[in-house]
Amino acid sequence: MKTTIQKTLMTARLFSGFWDRWSVHGVEDHVVSEIRPQLGNLEVWTDHFNKSGQLNENLAHSFYEKHLVNEAEYYYRLSALYYNLNQWIYPKQNDDKTYWFQKCLISIRKADAISSIDTRYVSIEISNHTCFGRVRLPANPVGCIIIVNPIDSSKEELFKYEMDFIRQNFITISFDGPGQGETYTFQGLKATQKRWMDFTDTVIEYAWSFFPDIPLYLFGTSSGASWAIYGSCNPKVTKAVAVSPAIRSEGIDLPAYFIERMNSVIEDKETILPNLHQLNIHKPIFMFHGALDVMTSSKTIYNLYDRLPSDKKFLEYEGEGHCCNYKLEKIRKLSMMWYLE
């Protein structure tokens, strides 16, 4: 019987779509093409991405010595993404996952240390456990965006989101919630629907307590999009963007490796998603959908959109699947324009 890691490696070797998420978040094409044919065991994976991480870390150091700080910052973040791939491959909390996540955090903090944007490492308490977050503070903020990450992603993976939002002078707040990233790896806190409700509410209250005079926006993808819609019901939130929201009770066939990964981080096997049909949604929502999405059907998305208040927007991409991966950069630009309308 194949383990979850073996199933993940097989999927990565056989299906190019596996890599879409990682490619749009920064993983280089040549790094993927070099490893795919060789993906027979875990050691090949960790060795390859460790070398890629070290290579980019060295490149970042070289740029920094030449006073090319922006380039150095980017390549430190890219090196962290490769180390993040190594922690991600382990579905369950263990020493190896912890080791690679620590390497990821070291690279991220090297990037933060040389960045012109102030970064603060923060935390909140959920179910007597610490949830770890980061806040980035441009000098003259026009708004504050809470990035709600998909359950299978860490905040470090989505560094391009931060970069795009910060360039346009938005404060960014990004936490790893129950079952996610740094919080799961170091605290062992698993996801339940109730914990995610508490987490979303607490992050919004946290943002409001520090930035009460700045418009508060939400940006979420996949399960994070569903929780962004939930969060939009909070009166402190101004607007929310939902990219490919995951809908509960959807009769879909998810890949075996993904189901097993989720079972490792979810305590309540029923669902960790909010029941969107029970929410009193009244704030503006901009929803994005990929027509080729096999995780959430177009019919389900259309039905949800019809229930939203009149001040809403919808954009569907014919050639995109779940999370609209290859349109994410454009989606972030459109979202920032819409936030400020």
Predicted ranges, named:
Residues F49, G53-N56, K92-P138:
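N-terminal cap/lid segment of alpha/beta-hydrolase-fold proteins
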Residues V142-P150:
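Short beta-strand element of the alpha/beta-hydrolase
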Residues Y161, K283, S297-D306:
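Short alpha-helix in the alpha/beta-hydrolase fold that links the catalytic acid
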Residues F165-T183:
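Conserved alpha/beta-hydrolase
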Residues K190-F211:
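Alpha/beta-hydrolase active-site loop
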Residues A225-I272:
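Hydrolase active-site cap/lid region
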Residues N280-H282, M287-H289, D293:
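Short beta-strand/loop motif that positions the catalytic acidic residue
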